[in-house]
Regions:
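Hydrophobic h-region of N-terminal signal peptides that target proteins for export
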Residues: 10-19
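Extracytoplasmic c-type cytochrome modules immediately beyond a signal peptide or single-pass transmembrane anchor
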Residues: 19-139, 153-186
């Protein structure tokens, strides 16, 4: 009986440790969901409370960077998460590097070739850092602020917060950008 208990305990301990060992991809996706989910929920709340969309622009201008910093403060020291795009609204905070641009161009090519799936998570080794990329597609609601027919009130708010804005003229289901988790080897 004691032998059975010892064997059962060993199996349970092994199972628990295997369950705790998540892959870098899974870890990155977890952090991406933390940022993406928080931003999406708060933005949707703004859109519900102000149907004009002006409040959403104000929210993005004043809160998106703060929320990104808050999410990053909850991550382990070896990890961070951020957003970027080819056509940016906030150049100073969300600029893309060469690797980001390469990945986004690959996503665009797969969209054009009709081989794209929104669940296409890319994992790229970059020195001692692994980057996990999740694509962000422009949904119909996004076009209120990122499309080609932006209301005057929204455009004024965008221009006030982002005088060098390039994040416009998207079409539904085009690549809006990516969320990137960067995880250092540890």
């Amino acid at each position: 009986m004691k032998l059975n208990n010892i064997i059962l305990s060993a199996i349970l301990l092994t199972s628990a440790s295997v369950a705790d060992d998540i892959t870098v991809k899974q870890e990155g996706v977890k952090y991406i969901k933390m940022l993406g989910g928080t931003l999406k929920n708060k933005l949707q709340s703004e859109m519900k409370s102000d149907k004009t969309g002006v409040g959403a622009v104000t929210f993005c201008t004043n809160e998106a960077t703060k929320i990104t910093a808050e999410v990053n403060s909850k991550l382990p020291a070896y990890a961070k998460v951020r957003r970027t795009a080819i056509k940016l609204r906030n150049f100073e905070k969300n600029g893309a590097d060469d690797l980001d641009m390469k990945i986004m161009k690959e996503y665009i090519a797969s969209i054009e070739a009709k081989t794209f799936t929104p669940k296409d998570i890319k994992v790229v080794e970059d020195g001692d850092v692994t980057r996990v990329y999740k694509p962000l597609l422009a949904k119909q609601v996004c076009l209120i602020c990122h499309g080609s027919k932006i209301s005057k009130a929204i455009q004024e708010e965008i221009t006030k917060g982002y005088p060098h804005d390039k994040a416009v003229n998207f079409e539904e289901n085009s690549l809006r950008g990516v969320i990137v988790a960067e995880i250092k080897k540890h």
